[in-house]
Amino acid sequence: MGLSDGEWQLVLNVWGKVEADIPSHGQEVLISLFKGHPETLEKFDKFKHLKSEDEMKASEELKKHGATVLTALGGILKKKGQHEAELKPLAQSHATKHKIPVKYLEFISDAIVHVLQKKHPGDFGADAQGAMKKALELFRNDMAAKYKELGFQG
């Protein structure tokens, strides 16, 4: 299920747009995740009190965490599938400390695609969307495999 060089290029081209403003992209991704799947908010103690989209938009903590999430994901995407070193600590914390189910990784992947479609329609056509979905699926599958190694059935 690997990506071709051309597919990785499509992924990294649009990711360059994300990196130009990681905090606002991260904020939008988390808001999209929480709006589409309110149950995911329960995994974030510091955001549980944010009930409305306006409250979420006003939260500097949410923006900061969104930037952290997308910075980590960007580091993984740039490895073009050779992301074992980057993935291991992420899987460890998400499986043992945060207990984030694999399903939630699917939800945030969908939120990322949604935000990219909205913010960068000219740079995120069908081919780029397909490549990004494949890259995010590769990430999720590898996270799930690590979860299994760690004995987490998320």
Swiss-Prot record:
Molecular functions per Gene Ontology: heme binding; metal ion binding; nitrite reductase activity; oxygen binding; oxygen carrier activity; peroxidase activity
Keyword line: Cytoplasm, Heme, Iron, Metal-binding, Muscle protein, Oxidoreductase, Oxygen transport, Phosphoprotein, Transport
Pfam family, one: Globin
PANTHER family: MYOGLOBIN
Source domain of life: Eukaryota
Family matches, as SUPFAM superfamilies: Globin-like
Assembly, per entry: Monomeric.
Subcellular location: Cytoplasm, Sarcoplasm
Annotated EC: 1.7.-.-, 1.11.1.-
Protein's name in the database: Myoglobin
Annotated O2 binding sites: H65
GO biological process annotation, one example: removal of superoxide radicals
Family the UniProt entry places it in: Belongs to the globin family.
Residues annotated for nitrite binding in this entry: H65
